[in-house]
Each structure stands twice: as structure tokens, then as C-alpha cells.
Amino acid sequence: MTNIIETVDLTDLVGLCATDDVAEGEILRVKLPSGHALAIYCVNGEFFATDDICSHGEASLSEDGSLDGYEVECSWHFGRFDIRTGHACAMPCEHPLRSWPVTVEGGQIFVDVGAHPV
């Protein structure tokens, strides 16, 4: 099952990668046209996107983090975030990550860039 947004302004969708580029239980770093880095996750066949940089420090979640179910752990201070919502789940992280609406179409992963200013 994929995480699909029902109503999306198609002008705000940006293609990031193919679904085959993100292995089950893995994290892939991608960049928006603005250069802003996102982390793409695949859990149980669903795809999720958050900002790639931990809200507590400057660690890349895709490069240094680890995925455990629906939570990503930052390797710097072991804070955790729910990849579905961006919610901070473990200290020292107090501020959520931005999570991005994901659409999967034709084997491609898109995010709604209208969801957040970058």
C-alpha cells in the first residue's frame, strides 16, 4: 500500500525518484529543485518524505540515521522522529521534522512542494 494524497495541485508536485530507488527499510537522500534536501523512506511498501536534516543538529538522517519501523533515529544524539508525521519521539529532539505529502504514480515518487516554503 502506498501513501497517496487524494487532492493535490499537480503544479506543486515534484518528481524525486523511482520507487525502485528506495529499498524496503532504507532511506534515500534527494534534493528539490531549490537544493533543499529530503529523506525518502520505504516502510511496508509505503513511501514517506521528511526534511533530511535533524531538527536538533545538522546531521543528515539519510546518510547517518537508521530506520526502525516508522521511526528514524539520528546518529548524533539518538533522537527519534516518526517518519509519517515528523513528530519528535525521543529526546533530545523536541522540534518536529517537516514531513512532505507523497504521491506515487507510475513507479515514480512525487512530493507536494506547495506544502512548505523552501
Curated annotation (Swiss-Prot):
Instruction: Check the record and name the InterPro entries matching this protein.
Output: Rieske_2Fe-2S, Rieske_2Fe-2S_sf
State the Gene Ontology terms under molecular function.
2 iron, 2 sulfur cluster binding; metal ion binding
Which cofactor does the UniProt annotation name? Answer: [2Fe-2S] cluster
GO terms in the biological process aspect are: catabolic process
Q: Which residues form the Rieske domain?
A: 14-111
Keywords from UniProt, A to Z, are: 2Fe-2S, Aromatic hydrocarbons catabolism, Electron transport, Iron, Iron-sulfur, Metal-binding, Transport
Per the annotation, how and in what number is the cofactor bound?
Answer: Binds 1 [2Fe-2S] cluster per subunit.
Asked if the Swiss-Prot or TrEMBL record annotates the protein with the keyword 4Fe-4S, the reply is no
Q: In which pathway does it act?
A: Aromatic compound metabolism; p-cumate degradation; acetaldehyde and pyruvate from p-cumate
> Which CDD domains does UniProt cross-reference here?
Rieske_RO_ferredoxin (cd03528)
The protein's induction, as recorded, is: Induced by p-cumate and repressed by CymR.
Q: Does the keyword Transport apply?
A: yes
Coiled-coil region? none
Binding of [2Fe-2S] cluster, residues? 54, 56, 74, 77
Q: How does it assemble?
A: The p-cumate 2,3-dioxygenase multicomponent enzyme system is composed of an electron transfer component and a dioxygenase component (iron sulfur protein (ISP)). The electron transfer component is composed of a ferredoxin reductase (CmtAa) and a ferredoxin (CmtAd), and the dioxygenase component is formed of a large alpha subunit (CmtAb) and a small beta subunit (CmtAc).
Its function?
Component of the p-cumate 2,3-dioxygenase multicomponent enzyme system which catalyzes the incorporation of both atoms of molecular oxygen into p-cumate to form cis-2,3-dihydroxy-2,3-dihydro-p-cumate. Functions as an intermediate electron transfer protein via a specific interaction with iron sulfur protein components (ISP)(CmtAb and CmtAc).
Which family does the entry's similarity section mention? Belongs to the bacterial ring-hydroxylating dioxygenase ferredoxin component family.
- By what name is this protein known? p-cumate 2,3-dioxygenase system, ferredoxin component
Write down the species: Pseudomonas putida
Q: Which gene encodes it?
A: cmtAd
